[in-house]
Amino acid sequence: MATKHILIKMKQSSPLQKGLITAGLMILASLFSLYILKNPVESYFQIIIYVIFSVGIVWSMFSYSKSVTDKKSFSNYFSIGFKTFIVVALLMTVFAFTYFSLNPEFRDNKIAENSRKLILEGSHLQAEIEENAAQLKKMFIPMMLSAAIFRYLIIGAIITLIAAGFLSKKNYKVL
């Protein structure tokens, strides 16, 4: 019996491993969308990225539900999901930093679009518009990274809460 327990433990991958796999799939899907399909960063393809993210979290928690441990409480499920989505959020933030650093034209297009809007408003001086563009250029990457981190943390927490609530029900039977 002890040997079976050890083999099952060895076959299970950790939330870290599942987070790495999930983030890898998300990065591959992002690269496919950006470079093969030529979608803009803010396309509807992002929904697929979030579905992969959600499935990765649930996969990690569901795998834990099949483990032989008796400690299957809401907090344990949440802990597994949390560890998974934190790894994904970290790697996706690194990916976003890398992408935006290597593709400054995305930043420049956003700044130009913002400047056009300010010109059309007609209530800004040219010097104000240029100063605004310079400020946006300085804070663009930190702003985009903050938004990415916040998005992944919020979505990850929501998915984890829902899945932990479902999986921790006493009458829930794992297939």
Protein language model features and the residues they cover:
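Transmembrane alpha-helical insertion/packing segments
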Residues: 2-63
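Alpha-helical transmembrane segments of multi-pass membrane proteins
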Residues: 13, 17-21, 79-91
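Short membrane-interface loop/juxtamembrane segments of multi-pass integral membrane proteins
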Residues: 118-140
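Individual transmembrane alpha-helix segments
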Residues: 134-157
